[in-house]
């Protein structure tokens, strides 16, 4: 009888312990910090993005077309979330939905998939987002300047030698001129608990929360004077040392350099024996930290004379000849004022015609000579 009572007591004890354990577990479970079960979209805050393109200068560049869309990137300053990205055909307004917190936001025209001469990288981080030009083959330049690149101490040549990918491909010394690209950004956009944007700290120093886009591309002019101008038939050229990339959030060119082939040359005779050639090109501008030393920019110029055979080759340090242009549609200009002397040669039977084919003048670029 005593053994039976003992067994009943042990059973009741185990039941009580189990009951208390279940009760404690239920208390712990109900006290956990759990995410609410309603749609998380309700936790997001509507943020109105207004964009003004009036000073972005799109009409001044070769494309000349107004933007047809824009991209908006918003980055949580904690870095715990992926950027919120919105691509839209609306150019003036878009609404994002973001969590409470502090955000950095930038906008730019079009989407990353719509640029034929640009590529984007680092777009998952606000500080690293950048755009850069893409390689463009220039057989004549890579062939004719291969030795110069290997021995030159210009910053661009040294950077090129240090770049294994560029060195592996002899025809990737140049990149395409960038097409028009404009952007603006706001840092420290605070979205508080009352779902009100409290503060904007824009790079453009506006405080109304509107993005005022600015062109990342500038237009540079090149002008070269000649003695013996009557002997000039055609020219081709490359400018090396200009900026290859642009930081979107910092809104300035980076230190990486590139070279662009220059086309669209026009020639003007000043006297019977003097004249000049000129053109313009589009670029991200001068690299960050540019100091206007001669070897920071080089103009690589080939001049074919009217005999159709003689080619004069020049590698001109022009980094100290950059100045602000007085022309409305040109930002900076490089002018070689000391005339280059061209020797006297006999004209071919075709005269100054542009139909002469020379075997070692690949990708011939003609100029209009105004006599």
Question: Each PLM stretch: what is its role?
Answer:
Residues 28-31:
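C-terminal motif of bacterial Sec signal peptides marking the signal peptidase cleavage site
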Residues 81-214:
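Short, low-hydrophobicity acidic/polar segments
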Residues 168-271:
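A sequence/structural signal for flexible, mid-protein segments enriched
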């Amino acid at each position: 009888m005593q053994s039976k009572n003992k067994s009943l007591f042990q059973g009741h004890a185990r039941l009580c312990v189990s009951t208390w354990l279940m009760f404690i577990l239920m208390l712990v479970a109900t006290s956990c910090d759990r995410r609410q079960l309603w749609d998380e979209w309700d936790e997001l805050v509507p943020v109105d993005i207004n964009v003004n393109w009036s000073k972005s200068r799109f009409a001044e560049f070769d494309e000349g077309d107004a933007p047809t869309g824009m991209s908006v990137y918003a980055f949580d300053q904690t870095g715990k979330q992926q950027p919120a990205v919105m691509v839209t055909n609306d150019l003036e307004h878009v609404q994002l939905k973001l969590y409470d917190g502090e955000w950095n936001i930038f906008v730019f025209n079009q989407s990353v998939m719509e640029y034929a001469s640009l590529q984007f990288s680092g777009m998952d981080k606000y500080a690293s987002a950048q755009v850069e030009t893409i390689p463009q083959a220039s057989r004549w330049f890579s062939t004719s300047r291969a030795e110069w690149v290997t021995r030159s101490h210009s910053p661009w040549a040294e950077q090129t030698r240090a770049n294994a990918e560029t060195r592996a491909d002899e025809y990737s010394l140049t990149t395409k001129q960038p097409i028009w690209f404009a952007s603006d950004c706001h840092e420290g956009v605070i979205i508080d608990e009352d779902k009100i944007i409290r503060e904007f700290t824009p790079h453009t120093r506006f405080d109304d929360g509107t993005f005022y886009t600015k062109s990342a591309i500038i237009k540079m002019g090149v002008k070269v004077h000649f003695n013996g101008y009557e002997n000039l038939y055609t020219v081709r050229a490359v400018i090396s040392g200009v900026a290859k990339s642009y930081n979107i959030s910092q809104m300035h060119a980076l230190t990486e350099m590139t070279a662009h082939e220059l086309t669209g040359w026009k020639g003007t005779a000043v006297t019977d024996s003097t004249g000049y050639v000129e053109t313009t090109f589009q670029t991200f501008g001068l690299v960050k930290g540019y100091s206007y030393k001669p070897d920071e920019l080089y103009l690589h110029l080939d001049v074919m004379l009217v005999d159709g055979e003689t080619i004069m080759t020049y590698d001109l340090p022009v980094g100290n000849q950059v100045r602000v242009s007085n022309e409305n549609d040109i930002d900076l200009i490089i002018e070689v004022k000391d005339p280059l002397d061209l020797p006297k040669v006999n004209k071919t039977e075709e005269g100054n015609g542009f139909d002469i084919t020379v075997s070692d003048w690949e990708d011939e670029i003609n100029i209009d000579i105004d006599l």
